[in-house]
Amino acid sequence: MKVLVPATTTNLGAGFDVFGLALDLFNEVEFSFDTKETTIESTGKYASDLKDHNLFFEVFRFFERKTGYRVPPVRIKQTCNIPVSSGLGSSAAVIVAALHIANEGTGRNLSREDLMKLAVELEGHPDNVVPAFTGGLVVCYQNGSHLDFEKFEIDLSLTFFVPNFSMCTNEMRKILPEKVPFEDAVFNIKNSCQFLAKIAAGKIKEALKYVGDRLHQNYRINGNKKMKEFVEAILSKNPEYWFVSGSGPSVCSNINDFEGIPYLKDVLKLRVNNRGMIVSE
């Protein structure tokens, strides 16, 4: 059996912890239960960037605690096409794949919605894992255990600039302030509402004018010297729009001149994936 889980980008600037978008780049995970011991093999472009496979085991143990079902031994072969720790949902892809595998191995007792709630609880926020399941642009709401979302299917291509350094999501969240100026909050509300209004009106490219943010990006950028240099180089190209993908360090922008951008490793031109996770026998 095989499951393909898409890369995701989140926040889209103004929509902090609310907007998530699935992309047409997939980690491919083949698995079978004809084994006596769980083994995990990783190949693909970004396999060498993985430190370990502990997240798979962490998800399996979490699934067992929450459901009471025991995940049987499984043989896993993962093709890593999503950059690791780069703000493109590599961890979310593992969580979604591992939960699917665990559910398959224990009799398919949980619905997609059940798995989604487990993924959100494990990840801590919904904006990566929900679009990985559903595809498309997702507007998420979470309040305690209550999860709600709406999905928009959109036709859009985006370019992501991936640097050769990584950033830890948890560490980047610690940088964020507990309080922000009132006018900064209003700025983000205006932009996120107008972004969504343009999406709802079918004016997809116009929506990208409203990705401006004052709640999280500057804190993350200024908290890392390499990140600051990387973003400043991109901004020096006078882009029409830009935003940090997730907690970084990848940046989405529409610049065409890549010369002189320090630390640049990959340029990924990706379309929105409106299907989400793909499962095949």
Curated annotation (Swiss-Prot):
It is found in: Cytoplasm. Keywords: Amino-acid biosynthesis, ATP-binding, Cytoplasm, Kinase, Nucleotide-binding, Threonine biosynthesis, Transferase. Belongs to the GHMP kinase family. Homoserine kinase subfamily. This is Homoserine kinase. It is an enzyme of class 2 (transferase). Its EC number is 2.7.1.39. Pfam families: GHMP_kinases_N (PF00288). The gene is thrB. SUPFAM superfamilies: GHMP Kinase, C-terminal domain, Ribosomal protein S5 domain 2-like. ATP binds at P83, V84, S85, S86, G87, L88, G89, S90, S91, A92, A93. GO terms for biological process: threonine biosynthetic process. It comes from Thermotoga petrophila (strain ATCC BAA-488 / DSM 13995 / JCM 10881 / RKU-1). The keyword Flavoprotein does not apply.
